[in-house]
Regions:
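Substrate-binding cleft and catalytic face of glycoside hydrolase catalytic domains
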Residues: 42-188, 220
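Non-catalytic positions within long, well-ordered alpha-helices that form the structural scaffold/packing
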Residues: 37-40, 84, 206, 297-298
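Boundary/entry segment of secreted carbohydrate-active catalytic domains
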Residues: 9-46, 50-52
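Aromatic-rich peripheral "rim/lid" segments of glycoside hydrolase catalytic domains that contact
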Residues: 59, 64-67, 91, 128, ...
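Structural recognition of alpha->loop->beta junctions
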Residues: 123-136, 199-212, 295-303
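Noncatalytic carbohydrate-binding groove/subsite architecture in carbohydrate-active enzymes
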Residues: 32-33, 81, 115-119, 123, ...
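Conserved, mostly hydrophobic/aromatic
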Residues: 18, 47, 83, 125, ...
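Secretory targeting and sorting signals
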Residues: 1-8
Length: 355
């Protein structure tokens, strides 16, 4: 067992989280009920789900905003109810692509989404889920060009979106937590801005509040202990870069909690590829995944660690960081993580689902 007897330096009651929207939300394959059984075996107490603006609102291709927009609520409502039956809470990321009437080029997508339109979207969503969803985050991977552009303007665009979303959520449901960031881990030329570069440019000289910072600390090809070379990148091995930057921003009163504290970390996507050119082999993958969760647990700033995807997608899918096959057969990575979470629960390191 890789969990020490004392948890003095560990994140107290860290949540183990999971995301697989195609399985849990859209029910595109496998089956939601069976997926929840697997989630319980992993010790999951939190399920992250993306509420994609243009996908869930009716008439997203229209150039003019409808007076009374309609949304596809049912699959979210049923997911929340089923998750609650398993002692699992929902964390919802409110994100683009945006409908055509809300973008700078009047096309459905991620080009210059207007904060005023996003505010109304957030109002509708939070009003509907008030009292049933207790944690939101604003936009997915805003430092990645495929989620927000123009790329150079992304920090400023994101700040406007975040402020609109944060204020609306706190007005409607003051008890709900709001996370800022949802950043990807590394710079990728013109495709992706390094998360620390993005964070500093986004905050600037503002005075922002949040309940936590959400980040995706992937490092697909290397050990969780191997530090990335980019000084503004943040992988699982270099979380200290992010906690240091958040401490600096708190000290300067640029970004902090309402009570004046440094933002805690919510690691809302993580995993290693199950196949393809970035597959590391089953044994190494299982060991790396387990070590990644252990690193998160031992960081006192981390409140949540999320495995991204559970079930293998159909043949031909580009992204596969799943832990079980299409028929539910557990991989060595699944067994390793399940064993680790069981041990962590026993010593009080991670949150336990209520019974």
């Amino acid at each position: 067992m890789l969990i020490p007897a004392t948890q003095a330096h560990a994140a107290r009651h860290m949540e183990v989280a999971l995301q697989d929207d195609q399985v849990f939300l859209n029910q595109s394959w496998y089956g939601r009920a069976k997926a929840f059984q697997k989630a319980e075996q992993l010790g999951v107490t939190r399920l992250r789900v993306n509420f994609i603006w243009a996908r869930e609102i009716r008439g997203a291709k229209r150039r003019h905003a409808p007076k009374d927009p309609g949304y596809n609520w049912y699959h979210f409502d049923s997911l929340i109810d089923e998750a609650a039956a398993h002692g699992i809470r929902i964390e919802m990321t409110l994100t683009g692509p945006a409908p055509a009437w809300a973008t700078g080029n009047h096309r459905m997508g991620v080009y210059k989404p207007r904060a005023s339109a996003f505010k109304r979207f957030v109002r509708d969503v939070v009003t509907h889920f008030k009292g049933r969803v207790d944690r939101y985050s604003i936009w997915n991977e805003p430092n990645w060009k495929s989620w927000l552009k123009p790329h150079r303007s992304a920090p400023h665009l994101y700040k406007l979106l975040y402020l609109a979303g944060y204020r609306e959520i706190k007005h409607i449901d003051p008890k709900a937590k709001v996370l800022i960031g949802e950043t990807s881990p590394q710079a990728r030329g013109r495709a992706g801005m390094a998360p620390l570069t993005f964070l500093r440019r986004m905050v600037g000289h503002s005075h922002l509040f949040a309940d936590g910072y959400a980040h995706h600390p992937y490092d697909y090809a290397r050990s969780p202990h191997k530090r990335s070379k980019g000084r503004n990148d943040v992988t699982i091995a270099t979380l200290g870069r992010l906690t240091h930057q958040l401490s600096v921003l708190r000290r300067k009163h640029r970004l902090r909690t309402r009570t004046g504290h440094v933002l805690p970390l919510y690691l809302t996507e993580y995993g290693y590829f199950a196949k393809g050119p970035r597959w590391l082999g089953n044994k190494r993958r299982a060991a790396y995944l387990r070590k990644g969760f252990q690193i998160a647990l031992h960081n006192p700033s981390v409140r949540e660690m999320t495995q991204y995807t559970l079930v293998a997608p159909p043949h031909g899918a580009v992204w596969d960081t799943s832990l079980v096959s299409s028929t539910g057969a557990p991989s060595s990575a699944f067994r390793s993580l399940s064993s680790w979470t069981l041990g962590a629960v026993r010593v009080g390191g991670i949150a336990r689902a209520p019974r």
